[in-house]
Amino acid sequence: VFENSVFIKNTLLYCSIAAFIDIVLAFFISYIVLRTKIIGRQLLDYVAMSALAIPGLVLGIGYLRTFYSFNLPWNDKPLASWWFMIVIILAVRRLPYALRACNAVLMQISKYLEESAESLGAQKTTIFRKILIPLMMGGLLAGFITSFSTATVELSATIMLVSTESDAPLAYAIYSYMQTAAGR
């Protein structure tokens, strides 16, 4: 398993991309849920947290059934066999961890900071870039680390989506090795 570094590279790549997707989504979902009055914001929070209630195997089967009938535009392989689907399922499964980290830190930031910047003429993008993101950096980093570290050991969903050994993450490779006579 450790003689071939492709598994480690895949794991680092997949989990890094998934954790980055998680913190970006978690930042915006947290902001929408905690700072806006949009109708349905609680539903958005519940949908984002629902990944904890759905087993990974069920999610993997759902992704296979959904994306197997669509082909990639540059070849005739099904969309479900593309390595980025593993990244997407890792991001979906770990989004609640990043979301709770972002919620916790955003609840501690006073709304008055945003309101005072807005009253001084700052745009929303400037408020995000210069006030919210620097103040939330600890929560974003905690969400990234939690999402990344828990995604590295995810097996139940990825086992359904790995189509070739060259796309497999380390957890899948360890599982495959344990199924051989040498791994027992």
For the regions a protein language model found, what residue spans apply to each?
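Interhelical loop and adjacent transmembrane-helix boundary motif
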Residues: 1-3, 152, 159-184
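Periplasmic/extracellular loop-to-transmembrane helix junction in inner-membrane transport proteins
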Residues: 1-20, 36, 179-183
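Membrane-interfacial helix termini and adjacent extracytoplasmic/periplasmic loops
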Residues: 2-5, 36, 40-44, 57-92, ...
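Transmembrane-helix boundary motif in ABC transporter permease subunits
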Residues: 17-48, 111-113, 124-131
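Short hydrophobic faces within alpha-helices
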Residues: 8, 33, 50, 113-120, ...
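Generic alpha-helical transmembrane segments of integral inner-membrane proteins
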Residues: 12, 16, 20-28, 54, ...
